[in-house]
């Protein structure tokens, strides 16, 4: 067995190991966490190389080599001498190294577990917030549905009202047209009745849909009846316009009758009597003008032939003749154009013209008065035609229901837009929370993978340390064998 030769007497008893035996010992690096490293063969100086070639090194050379190794380790730490190393039990050193490695791995595992726990807490908080926002979104959707339902209720009520009024007014127009012998009036009434019935069917479908009936079926009925109602109303409006045009053509003779009366000598009489005339004189002139205009206008509607009657039947025949004239007037011009109606219109037109001429003062001119009277007659004729061929009640109901429906729809749409905006914000927040939760879940998976790798590395390091201890024991056994 080889010995280590030393220049000092105190090292005479130190056992020497060959370079071959020292190089067979596996060393563990502090930065490898227990991983087995390659064998290191180092030389320190030319003298050391010579000693290695001869197979022997001195204690001083070994101390210098250890000092160079320890000086290369960073940090301010104690540098034990070679005898201290030789006196250290390698088994204890290996156990200390194993404990250190396991402690490092345990701290790392604890840190990863804490990270996983925090990630789980973040996920729970995000999930609770997401559930709360889902609940808010559902509540907003319920509110939106409730507002839409209320809007549907108001719409159905308005449709019921419009449909009922159109049906009633259509029936009245049919009766009136039948009594007056006006087929256009009857056709207009039938169109209004059809529009009203379609409107009531539409309102019934809307009511049924709100009560839980099949939505698609009710919506199809609503679409069809809406088109039918609109078409019937358009037909009724066209018939009303036709009646207005026909009546206007028939009432052109009224203006002609007024002009004829003014040109027949009544105008000169008015000029003469207006000098210093008062209210009573104006009223009398207007009354006379109305009677003459009504008589002249009614002659246009007298039958061409008149039956002969006995003396005792003259009064009855005259009354029948007057009724026929009245019927012809109302059937051709409108219900306002009776003898009394024409008389009232002519009287009002003449009275307004006379009063205006008096207010203006100056010389009373027949031409100026004539123009004023004819203009007033034209306005009153148009007003009477529009009044006869239209129903203010129906128009008022239509305007009221349509306006209320539009206002209600506008308010509901405004609230709906606000709720939809809130829902969109909640959806955006949910997507952001989903993204954060996904990132957190991915980070948890990464940390779990690192934790698994850490446990695997810890086991591998422990096995390497045990292998090192086994190898050291083998070396010790061989050394003991050599010493023996």
Curated annotation (Swiss-Prot):
This is SPI-2 type 3 secretion system translocon protein SctE. It is a multi-pass membrane protein. The keyword Membrane applies. Residues 107-152, 413-457 form a coiled coil. Keywords: Coiled coil, Host membrane, Membrane, Secreted, Transmembrane, Transmembrane helix, Virulence. It holds the Pfam family SseC. GO terms for molecular function: protein-folding chaperone binding. The core secretion machinery of the T3SS is composed of approximately 20 different proteins, including cytoplasmic components, a base, an export apparatus and a needle. This subunit is involved in the formation of a pore, called the translocon, in host membrane. May form a complex with SseB and SseD/SctB2. SseB is required for correct localization of SseC/SctE2 on the bacterial cell surface. The keyword Membrane applies. It comes from the Bacteria. The gene is sctE2. One of its GO terms (cellular component) is extracellular region. Component of the type III secretion system 2 (SPI-2 T3SS), also called injectisome, which is used to inject bacterial effector proteins into eukaryotic host cells. SseC/SctE2 and SseD/SctB2 are inserted into the host membrane where they form a pore and allow the translocation of effector proteins into the cytosol of target cells. Required for the translocation of SPI-2 effector proteins. Required for systemic Salmonella infection of the mouse. Essential for SpvB-induced actin depolymerization in the host cell cytoplasm. The chain crosses the membrane at residues 85-105, 152-172. Disruption phenotype: Mutant is severely attenuated in virulence. Disruption prevents SpvB-induced F-actin depolymerization in human macrophages without affecting intra-bacterial SpvB protein levels. It is found in: Secreted; Cell surface; Host membrane. Its main location: secreted. It comes from Salmonella typhimurium (strain LT2 / SGSC1412 / ATCC 700720). Belongs to the SctE/SipB/YopB family. GO terms for biological process: protein secretion by the type III secretion system.
């Amino acid at each position: 067995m080889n010995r280590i030769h030393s220049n000092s007497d105190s090292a005479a008893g130190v056992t020497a190991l060959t370079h071959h035996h020292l190089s067979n010992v596996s060393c563990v690096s502090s930065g490898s966490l227990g991983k087995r490293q390659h064998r290191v063969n180092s030389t320190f100086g030319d003298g050391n190389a010579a000693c290695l070639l001869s197979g022997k090194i001195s204690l001083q050379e070994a101390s210098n080599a250890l000092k160079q190794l320890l000086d290369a380790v960073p940090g301010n730490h104690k540098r034990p001498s070679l005898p201290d190393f030789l006196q250290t039990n390698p088994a204890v050193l290996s156990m200390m190294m194993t404990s250190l490695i396991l402690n490092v791995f345990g701290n790392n595992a604890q840190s990863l577990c804490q990270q996983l726990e925090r990630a789980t807490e973040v996920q729970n908080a995000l999930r609770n917030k997401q559930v709360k926002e889902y609940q808010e979104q559902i509540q907003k959707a319920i509110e939106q549905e409730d507002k839409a339902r209320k809007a549907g209720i108001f719409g159905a009520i308005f449709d019921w009202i419009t449909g009922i009024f159109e049906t009633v007014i259509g029936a009245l127009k049919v009766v009136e047209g039948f009594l007056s012998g006006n087929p256009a009036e009857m056709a207009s009434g039938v169109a209004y009745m059809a529009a009203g019935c379609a409107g009531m069917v539409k309102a019934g479908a809307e009511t049924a849909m709100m009560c839980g009936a099949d939505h698609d079926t009710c919506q199809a009925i609503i679409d069809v009846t809406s088109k039918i109602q609109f078409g019937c109303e358009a037909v009724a409006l066209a018939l009303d316009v036709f009646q207005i045009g026909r009546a206007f053509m028939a009432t052109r003779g009224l203006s002609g009758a007024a002009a004829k009366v003014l040109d027949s000598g009544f105008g000169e009489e008015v000029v003469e009597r207006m000098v210093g005339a008062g209210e009573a004189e104006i009223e009398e002139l207007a009354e006379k003008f109305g009677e003459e205009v009504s008589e002249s206008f009614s002659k246009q509607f007298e039958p061409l032939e008149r039956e002969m009657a006995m003396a005792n039947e003259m009064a009855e025949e005259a009354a029948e003749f007057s009724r026929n004239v009245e019927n012809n007037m109302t059937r051709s011009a409108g219900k306002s154009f009776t003898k009394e109606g024409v008389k009232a219109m002519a009287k009002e037109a003449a009275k307004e013209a006379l009063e205006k001429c008096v207010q203006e003062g100056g010389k009373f001119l027949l031409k100026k008065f004539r123009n004023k009277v004819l203009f007033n007659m034209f306005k009153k004729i148009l007003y009477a035609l529009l009044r006869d061929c239209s129903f203010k009640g129906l128009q008022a109901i239509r305007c009221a229901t349509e306006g209320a429906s539009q206002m209600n729809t506008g308010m509901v749409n405004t609230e709906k837009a606000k709720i939809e905006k809130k829902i969109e914000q909640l959806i955006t927040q949910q997507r952001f929370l989903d993204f954060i939760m996904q990132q957190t879940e991915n980070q948890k998976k990464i940390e779990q993978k690192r934790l698994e790798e850490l446990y695997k590395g810890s086991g591998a390091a422990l096995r390497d340390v045990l292998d090192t201890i086994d190898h050291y024991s083998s070396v010790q056994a061989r050394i003991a064998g050599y010493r023996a």
